[in-house]
């Protein structure tokens, strides 16, 4: 059963792997013209960064849709909270159904979709698994489904970052080798640790410094904001697991993708912040827009009769 499922997934990933190999070889060839060697681990690592650039640039329209969806969710958060308060403490099936129906009606009327914010991550998962398969295939046989075949596939397999770190090596592989008293690669463990630390640092900075500036004050006590705070603690744990288990090539992909996400979020918030947020007020100040409440009003002329009455 599981063998059949695995073969089915392999067949689905074939076209994705082919596209990934095409992009990797394109950037590797381009870097070759710039003086990087065929077996240079840095060349292949930068090719993976190039893959990130292509994928994330392609997903910019999806990211913009995600931003709009997040903004809609923040706008309707007070209404959602009122419905939740209305049914607070009611655990019967009828009450729960009524609450869900009212919330779905709000989503429909306001054009909000809670799942839209997950689209960029969901759409990247096939690329993640495809790249994992490409690295695994290169490690096992040095052959791919596209241009990573023959000598080029062998070059990809034999490439080393800093001359010693294979793209297919992982922290866990060398950690277990160390535990067993076998030969291990300390540099691989250091590189994997550094990449994981960068992923966590970028994520924490984005969640603590960038995103809160775009949250309106009336939305900071809502479940949407609280869920984001929960993710603040869950994502570093997930990244630690990735850093321990996944090959260096995959860590390069996710680190570069994480940096892209952080910069993209910062630029989007800087240029188009949510109304009512700190970022929105800062943008108004940058543009020299005065608040209507504090803007001075032109004094009205007083006619002679009104002046005499005074």
Swiss-Prot record:
Query: Which keywords does this chain's UniProt record carry?
Result: Cell membrane, Chaperone, Membrane, Protein transport, Transmembrane, Transmembrane helix, Transport
Spell out the subcellular localization from the entry: Cell membrane
Highest taxon of the source? Bacteria
Q: Which GO terms describe its biological process?
A: protein insertion into membrane; protein transport
Q: How does it sit in the membrane?
A: Multi-pass membrane protein
The segments labelled Disordered in the record are 290-310
Gene Ontology terms for molecular function: membrane insertase activity
One GO location term (cellular component): plasma membrane
TM helices/strands, residue ranges = 16-36, 44-64, 115-135, 186-206, 232-252
Q: What is its main location?
A: membrane
- Family statement drawn from the similarity comment of this UniProt entry: Belongs to the OXA1/ALB3/YidC family. Type 1 subfamily.
Instruction: Fill in the subunit field for this protein.
Output: Interacts with the Sec translocase complex via SecD. Specifically interacts with transmembrane segments of nascent integral membrane proteins during membrane integration.
What is this protein's function per UniProt?
Required for the insertion and/or proper folding and/or complex formation of integral membrane proteins into the membrane. Involved in integration of membrane proteins that insert both dependently and independently of the Sec translocase complex, as well as at least some lipoproteins. Aids folding of multispanning membrane proteins.
Tell me what this protein is called: Membrane protein insertase YidC
UniProt organism field:
Tropheryma whipplei (strain TW08/27)
